[in-house]
């Protein structure tokens, strides 16, 4: 594979020559073709050009039929330091976002004028921004195989050269911030190619157009000449047959890096003609064109290597200038005139292209001839119009803006260049290398004549012109000689043909004169024949009529047969349509029945799944309810024990306090005898407080007991409610299942009856058996499922009724316990009231018998102690009895709950097992039904096929009998006039013909003519007769 020419990879160069591996920069002259995008030397390569406009080539062309407008970019330079010092006003304003440039005519009391362009860059725009936004896409198109042109256009001193070139020198490996379009495009091209790792080659050319003369800026200078003569080496510009410009003798240099191109640019720019004017200290006095040719190798699908060619033309035009303002004199004035002339021609070309003029004046200037492809051709073009903001240059600025705005409307037709086959280029290069080797060998051996290069090129051009002219004249001479020979031969042929034609005419005149006599005799005999035929025409007419009637009868019979055939075909079609309709209806019925079964089984499966989920949910609800009930029972039991213990402790503490109080009363009776009334009153208050406290405690115990009882009752009520809802749900589910089963049974029976009525005899028998089997199977399945569901419902109702009974008994026991606690509270309250009343009576008696109270203290103490003991014992007995009853109730409830849990788990497991068994039976039934449906479909297909075959067989037999086997008489085609009763023999008829060959021989013998040899004498005689040879005969005919 070829390697990209890179100095760091030159060690990889192999021994054979290769177009991509040139060991050193090469300078050679070529004929550069501008108008069609390729060089003349490339155009000679086996008919393969570099542009896409010449038809098919080895690699094909990539065309774009769509037209593209020329891209116009406007750049406004900032005011110079001198203009700023002079306070020169700015006459234009730039809007980069709106891409508009406004000419401020308001300074002259006129309306402002606005121009819109593809891109607008104001005075603060940087070089990099201009390149990235305007030129970088053009560079990418060049690498895709297009010819592209970028040129700067504007007044002198507006920054065209600065925009195109800028500062060439690099700072380290980076470009300067002021680098222009050309160095940035070169750097981008190398960066993109290196990034793609492409195999490529690159060549550059650099020319100058000064005073309508083209100069090669890269040509080697002749050091033997004076410096003023070195600049006068001009190159000729010619046109080919297509009207394209051809530059002969322009050198192209192979380059390998960007630095080489920079050096060539600096070298060529230094040789350009510049001068100091009043408007620009370094004004370019010529147009320059720097061209980059890029060849990139591509590999096709078939591993064929092609070369993609692209060209980038970077044009720096000289600026138009006002001679009066620039201060040009004599030679400088003539230079400015030539520049303005070429730029004016460019303006006329732009105007003609915009106005779609028939004639575009490309040939009026060499500049427009060079830019012909870029303006209205096949290249992509970008025009950078540069203007000055100074009010002093307003007129030139408006002209530039006007031309740039018009150039926007120019339409090019960009076409990608043809991809040239690598083998063609290699062959061409090998031939050129052989020629160069011969030249080097001749130079080494000093075997030849050495003359200056310019004269040698001129002489070679003249020699070539002469050779071409000589070849053209020789070709013309040969063609003329061949024309003379062909004319002589044609003359002899015509002379011979003329003599033969005269002889033939004489022969025909003689034949015609004899034929007239023969015709007379034929007419007479024809009259005799006509009389005989008229006699026989009556008999022949009668016979023909009879044959016509027979033919009509045969035709009518044949028509009847064809009518019968059409009716038979129609009947067979109707029968076939009927059978097909029945088969289709049966098939649709089977499919709908299959769909109904699928829907039923899917619904049954869904209902089974829902039933399983509901059973699981009921199981969870039951378990949670039982757990909650157990928790509530345990809580109630614990609270009852705690309240009983609290009640015992309260009674014991009360008794203890009473005993202690009596003891204190006895011990201090003597001390408080004086204060007895006060003590009695305090005792009353203490007794009232104690009674109230005991009453509050009793009420609190009663409320807690009521709350526990109400909670238990509510729990049992919830269980009863859940059980009732579960029963309702089971009944509803059972009713839905029964209704669905009944509906399925009814639908199935209706479909079976309809199927039996609609099918044919044979199919009816099969389907009747299938329907009976399916009906029996479905009925059995439905009966089993109904029985199972009823048994499960009964069992579930029994369990739920047991659960309700347990909940009812638990509720009744809780209510009885609550009533018992309430009655006990009432009894305790009454006893407490009685004790309170007794105490009050005692206190009243004590008040009355205060004097005798000491004697009764012992008796009172004994009575109170006995009373406390009795109350404590009764309370302890009641608490113990209550605790035992609660424990027994709790044990019973736990036993019943355990039994119910076991029964409920067994019931739910049985229900789940039954549901799963039902689901399995449904799956088996579904498989059997699908098998039956498939068998029925196959039978229907077989019936349809057999019926179609039988119908076709009947039709073929009918066609055979009516078309091939049916025999009919052939109609008589002979007419009455064709028969002759008195016909002549063949010999007599042949005698009526004119003996033409004998007459010709006789004619020639009488006139002493011997074939064609004596044609000339006959021609001479014939030419002397002034009349036409057929005139007597025609006259006779008249």
Curated annotation (Swiss-Prot):
Keywords annotated in UniProt: ATP-binding, Coiled coil, Cytoplasm, Cytoskeleton, Microtubule, Motor protein, Nucleotide-binding
Stretches the record annotates as Disordered: 1-63, 1013-1038
GO cellular component: cytoplasm; mitotic spindle; spindle microtubule
Residues annotated as domain Kinesin motor: 69-410
Presence of the UniProt keyword Endoplasmic reticulum in the record: no
SMART domains according to UniProt: KISc
Compartments it resides in: Cytoplasm, Cytoskeleton; Cytoplasm, Cytoskeleton, Spindle
Compositional bias segments (type: Gly residues): 49-61
Pfam families: Kinesin
Keyword Nucleotide-binding set for record: yes
Residue ranges, compositional bias (Basic and acidic residues): 24-34
Binding site for ATP: 154-161
Any single biological process term in GO: mitotic spindle assembly
Example GO molecular function: ATP binding
Coiled-coil regions listed: 453-502
UniProt family annotation: Belongs to the TRAFAC class myosin-kinesin ATPase superfamily. Kinesin family. KIN-5/BimC subfamily.
PANTHER family linked: KINESIN-LIKE PROTEIN KIF11, KINESIN-LIKE PROTEIN KIN-5B
Job description of the protein: Responsible for microtubule translocation. May be important for the organization of phragmoplast-specific arrays of microtubules. Plays an essential role in stabilizing the mitotic spindle. Required during mitotic cytokinesis.
Protein name: Kinesin-like protein KIN-5B
Organism: Oryza sativa subsp. japonica (Rice)
UniProt gene name: KIN5B
